[in-house]
Amino acid sequence: MITSKDRSIVRELAKQVRDRAELPIMEARRALWYQHNDLKTTRPIIATFPEVAWHEIIPPESLQCENEEFRFMETILRGKLFRADVIRDDVPIERTWEVTKIITDDGFVKDGKGHASVANNPDYRDNCLGGINYLWLHSYKFNPNAGHFDPIIKEYEDLDLIKTPEVTYHEKESMEKLAIHQDALGDILDVQFRGQKWLYFAMMETYTNLRGLQEVMEEIYEEPEMLEDGMERFAQAYHELLDQYVKYDLLDLNNDQSYSGSGGLNYTHDLPKYPGGAKDTRNFWGFCESQEFTMVGPEQHWQFVMKHEAKMAERFGLFSYGCCEPADKKLKYILTIPGIRRISVSPWADVEVCAEQIKDKAVYSWKPMPSTFINSFDAMEPLVRRMLEATKKHGCCPEIVLKDTGTCNNDPASYGRFTELCRRLIEEYYG
């Protein structure tokens, strides 16, 4: 049931978001992102994504709406206002309000077998092509306890369980959702109906979730043929999964405020490149990462995983690579990925080595250590300085992406202090 109270709450919040979006600073931030992603400026850009810590910023008990769909709207709207008023980073507030088509699939394993979550979370369902919200919702539940893991793929013949997910578009439910959002917000914000925009291909993560991380590491030496075969099958399945999204017109162009790779935004004038719009994946950003291969050498990383990721990248106009895995020892391969435009420089990567090799060939997407931000804020300044010195010396196009903060120690204002720190240092180094 939708009450007048719920409707009044989200409409008032939407008006505040609209007002923030129309501020001149937001247009300046959009222009900065376009220059940044098009590799036309070396001035660092700042983007913060609190992720799990959104639970502390907007606690579920603080929400005023009662209807579940309106609680979703309220959460997103309050998140946008928090970004504009407290974080104050370079992420612009847009007047657009996207309603995403409801799309599901039946997974990569025959007979419906599979783990809903290796994190032992019954409320989490992995979208096989990837999906990301503006913020982590109040309804997400995470069990911090360890859970027993029983691999589905135990023997070589179990690879025959792998299949291509079959996609289903729930049009009726999607249109009903669109109508609710349009009715509530359509005269205030620009409500847009959108398909999949964040295109994420987690080949090794998918295999590891079914095989087990220790088992995969052992396979490298004991059964490399099995690992090669398994990755060939998952690569083919991901290609066929993407084909379905194209065939059923379930994609929407992502050269806008869409989340990019493992952090950042997709604003660019370099896309779209070809006629056909969303029917041609060459007009999109794509994204791959292989965190599970962090401790594996560059040659084997290429042999077992990255060659498949590079093949996937051929289908896209621009590509992001990496997440938490350190890139410094693998850049000779990463830089050969077709269309590479954003490279994750994780907290464990050597910032100097990465700066020397990346230069202005791609966006240098630096992720400061979130545990330092959480536990020792005063230690953040030397980390930021070290990155700024390295990237300025080598003429990089850097961005500072604070993410993976599992908590903010119930101090939401700390995100604003981090932005202030970064702005002060950027001004010192760049003027």
Feature-to-residue mapping (PLM):
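Active-site loop segments of alpha/beta catalytic cores
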Residues: 1-51, 57-73, 79-83, 90-93, ...
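A generic structural signal for solvent-exposed, polar alpha-helical segments
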Residues: 39, 103, 114, 140-142, ...
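Compositionally biased, low-complexity repeat tracts
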Residues: 110, 126-127, 143, 208
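Aromatic-residue-lined binding/catalytic grooves and analogous aromatic/hydrophobic interfacial grooves
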Residues: 119-129, 134-136
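A gly/proline- and charged-residue-enriched helix-loop-helix capping module
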Residues: 138-179
